[in-house]
Design a protein with these regions (language model features):
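Basic helix-extension-helix modules of the SAP/HeH family
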Residues: 1-80
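Accessory beta->alpha helical hairpin/"wing" motif in late/C-terminal subdomains of nucleic-acid enzymes
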Residues: 9-23, 69-97, 159-182
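Short alpha-helical segments that sit at the start of domains
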Residues: 12-36, 92-109, 207-211, 224
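Charge-enriched amphipathic alpha-helical scaffolds
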Residues: 14-15, 58-69, 133-164, 242-281
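Short capping segments at the starts of secondary-structure elements
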Residues: 46-53, 116-124, 224-226, 238-244
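Short, amphipathic alpha-helical interaction segments positioned at domain boundaries
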Residues: 82-117, 172-198
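Long, charge-rich C-terminal accessory regions
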Residues: 140-247
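Cys/His-clustered metal-coordination modules, chiefly Zn-binding fingers
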Residues: 295-299
C-alpha cells in the first residue's frame, strides 16, 4: 500500500515527496476556488488596491493558509503573496488548467442554481446537467466533480446525505424530510440558461417584472434602492425556502421599520407581493412556481 511504501523510504525522500505534492495541492485549491476570491488573490499578487470587503477575504481566507503575509506599518496594512503561490497563479494561464477552471466555474453555476431551485437533489441530477452539451473527455470529469463537491461542502454551500446533495440552508432533519416529501410525485423543473444566469452567483431572486413591481413599491417607501434590493433578497429566500406568504412578509417589513404613507400604498404593495409570490420558483414545487403549475393563487 501507499502507507507501507512511505514507511520504507528515508526522511529525505519523504520530504521530497511532500514538497513536490504542495504545488499540486495549491493548484487544485485555486482551480476549484470561488472565482471572486481568486480574483482578489490575483489583485493581491499584482499589488492592486483592494476594497474593505476584499481585505476581509484576504485576512479570513488566505492569511491563515499561509498564502499571503500581512505587514502593518504606520496603521497601514500591506499584503505580500508567497512565491510558491505566485508560481501556481501564473500556471493558471495554461490551456489544460484553463479547461479545468472553466469546468469548475460551470459546475459552480449549476450547483448554485440547483441549490436555489430544489433545496435537495440527487447527485445524478447534478452530473446529468453538468454533462449536457459539454465535452470534457481530456480530463478526469468524475474525479474533478467529486473534488468540487468537497469544496462546496468546505464552503458550507451544501452537505451530502447518501446520494442527495442538501442545501446548507436546511437546518434540521424535519426540514429535510419535509422537502423530500414535497418532491414526491413531482418532476423537477429543468433550469434554462436564463435561470443559471440569474442564480449562478448564489442569488435567491430573479429580477422579473413581478419582482420589479414590488421593488418599486418598497423603494418608494424607504427611499433607498440598495437597501430595498437587500430586503427583497432576504424575503425572496424565505419565500423559496419556507413558503412565506403576504402576512409574514408584511410583518417582516414592519419589523424593519418600513412605514407606509397611506392605505393605498399598502394595497399597492400587497397586490404586487401577491403576483410576485405566485411567480417565485420554490423548493416545495421542485423548482417550479405556483403560477407555472397553474395552482390557485391564495395570496
Amino acid at each position: 500500500t501507499e502507507e507501507t511504501s512511505l514507511e520504507s523510504i528515508g526522511r529525505k525522500e519523504k520530504e521530497h515527496i511532500l514538497l513536490s505534492d504542495i504545488p499540486k495541492h495549491l493548484e487544485s485549491q485555486m482551480i476549484f476556488m470561488d472565482l471572486n476570491k481568486l480574483k482578489v488573490l490575483i489583485r493581491v499578487m499584482n499589488q492592486y488596491p483592494i476594497e474593505p470587503m476584499e481585505t476581509t477575504i484576504v485576512n479570513e481566507e488566505f492569511v491563515p493558509k499561509g498564502w499571503v503575509f500581512d505587514f502593518v506599518e504606520d496603521n497601514e496594512c500591506t499584503f505580500v503573496i508567497t512565491e510558491q503561490v505566485r508560481q501556481v497563479l501564473m500556471k493558471l494561464k495554461q490551456d489544460d488548467v484553463q479547461q479545468q477552471m472553466e469546468f469548475a466555474f460551470g459546475v459552480r453555476c449549476i450547483m448554485n442554481t440547483c441549490v436555489r431551485l430544489y433545496g435537495v437533489f440527487g447527485q445524478d441530477l447534478l452530473a446529468d446537467m453538468v454533462l449536457e452539451g459539454q465535452d470534457y473527455e481530456s480530463m478526469n470529469r468524475d474525479e474533478n466533480l467529486e473534488t468540487l463537491l468537497r469544496v462546496f461542502e468546505d464552503e458550507q454551500i451544501i452537505s451530502r446525505k447518501g446520494n442527495n446533495i442538501v442545501s446548507c440552508k436546511i437546518e434540521s432533519e424535519e426540514q429535510y424530510t419535509d422537502i423530500i416529501n414535497s418532491h414526491i410525485g413531482k418532476n423537477n423543473y429543468m433550469p434554462t440558461d436564463h435561470d443559471i444566469e440569474a442564480y449562478c452567483f448564489g442569488k435567491w431572486v430573479d429580477k422579473t417584472a413581478e419582482y420589479d413591481a414590488v421593488y418599486s413599491c418598497l423603494k418608494r417607501e424607504i427611499k433607498d434602492s440598495e437597501q430595498a434590493e437587500e430586503m427583497l433578497e432576504e424575503i425572496g429566500e424565505r419565500i423559496v425556502v419556507d413558503d412565506w406568504s403576504i402576512p409574514q412578509i408584511m410583518n417582516c417589513l414592519y419589523d424593519w421599520d418600513v412605514g407606509f404613507d397611506n392605505p393605498q400604498s399598502v394595497r399597492r404593495m400587497t397586490k404586487s407581493l401577491s403576483e410576485w409570490i405566485y411567480s417565485v420558483r420554490r423548493w416545495s414545487e421542485y423548482g417550479y412556481s405556483r403560477k407555472e403549475k397553474q395552482l390557485p393563487n391564495d395570496q
